[in-house]
């Protein structure tokens, strides 16, 4: 028999009971009568269909369900909060230490396996999850790293390294807004950490300025530079410099560069003169258009990737 009809009958039975004994106002009683009529029409059920009655009334079923709530089995996905034995804790630490050694040897897959074994023995240790996140990042599994960092933060919300490694993984996934938030949290917990400061700055730059699709190596916008009138003007000025023309002429002819220092080889003199010309060009750019120089500097910083130097130190 259709259980929906049984359920509808139980509800209608309950509403009729409320009409008789509920002590309701006239308006409330009228509303219940309308509700009963709607249910009877929708399900084709009336109170006379006693064959649909259940052994228990709806209030009795509800009371039984709420009273047994505490006896429901635990969600199997919930972490086991039973403290590990001393033997398991010691073995988990040994596995973690061995995993750290494998990280130093760049055996990242082995490290993931060892940290996983440590987690099986002691799933309440945030360090194990955070260390495995670092190994996952080394393997390019940034999604796995994010998940392990989330577990570590769930266990220990004050663990700064978990936030820092989360920022690294999110940056690698180009989720710079989220990375910025996690780097800021890491700095709140460890305000003197220079790596977090540097990575936060890089993530903020990447968030503000998306790399140009025509950018060159390292996402430096070469096309933009070549089309910038300030850059063209200063480059033309440099190329028309008598000093640079004399230098280039000497390098092409293979002769000694008169700009070099006495006693130095032609190659050394040419190199020193070329460096000097480059420095003069940079100074000229800084004096004539400091905003443009800052733009170039920002592009160079933006092209860098966050550093994991501090994060590579496993605990």
From Swiss-Prot:
Residues 72-84, 91-100 have a biased composition (Basic and acidic residues). The modification Phosphothreonine is found at residues 82, 305. Residues 65-100, 249-270 are annotated as: Disordered. It comes from Mus musculus (Mouse). The lineage of its organism: Eukaryota, Metazoa, Chordata, Craniata, Vertebrata. The modification N6-acetyllysine is found at residue 138. Belongs to the SGT family. This is Small glutamine-rich tetratricopeptide repeat-containing protein alpha. PROSITE patterns: TPR, TPR_REGION. Homodimer. Homooligomer. Interacts with DNAJC5 and DNAJC5B. Interacts (via TPR repeats) with HSP90AA1. Interacts (via Gln-rich region) with SLC2A1. Interacts with HSP90AB1. Interacts (via TPR repeats) with HSPA8/Hsc70; the interaction is direct. Interacts with BAG6 (via ubiquitin-like domain); interaction prevents interaction between BAG6 and RNF126. Forms a multiprotein complex, at least composed of DNAJB12, DNAJB14, HSPA8/Hsc70 and SGTA; interaction with DNAJB14 and HSPA8/Hsc70 is direct. TPR repeats lie at residues 92-125, 126-159, 160-193. The keyword Transmembrane helix does not apply. Its main location: cytoplasm. InterPro entries: SGT, SGTA_dimer, TPR-like_helical_dom_sf, TPR_rpt.
